[in-house]
Every structure is written in C-alpha cells, then in structure tokens.
Amino acid sequence: MNTMNRVEQFRKIAQDITDLYEIKDRCYGNSFGQTYEKLGIISAVTRISDKYNRLCNLATNKDIDNLGESIEDTLKDMAAYCIMTIREIRHNG
C-alpha cells in the first residue's frame, strides 16, 4: 500500500469517527464536556479506560457476546473520546 492510499484510508476512518460523533452528540449533548468541567481529566481517562477494557475483552474472549459492538466500533469510540479529550484540554486547560 502506498502513502496516498494509507492517507486516504486514514482520512476515511477519521470521517467515520466524525460522523459517529455527530450522531452521538445529538443523543447525549455535551455530557462529556460537562463531566470534564466538573471532574477534569480523570473523567476522560475513565471513559477511555472503559473502552480499552472492552477492547481487551473483545480481543481475548472469542465467546463474548459483543452486543452489536465490534472491535472496530470500540476503537472508533475510543478515538472519539481521545479527540474529545484534546478538545476539552484546549478549551479548559
């Protein structure tokens, strides 16, 4: 795979994450930002850690019922939480 294909694939995945964020933001509003303002970085660490633990469970337990959440879904959620955390750090310090 050449560099442009990798960059194009990265851009597509980033757009998928943005689309997912937009849908969830309509459902949840700014609950992440509000919690971050109250509790700080630990609130973000907790959510990212939950997703990491979910990823580990999905990756190591083939018999687990994933309830419709695939490894890819979990990674997208984790990436979104990381980006949202960067946004909060830039906004709130």
Residue ranges and their predicted role:
Residues 1-93:
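Intrinsically disordered, low-complexity regulatory regions
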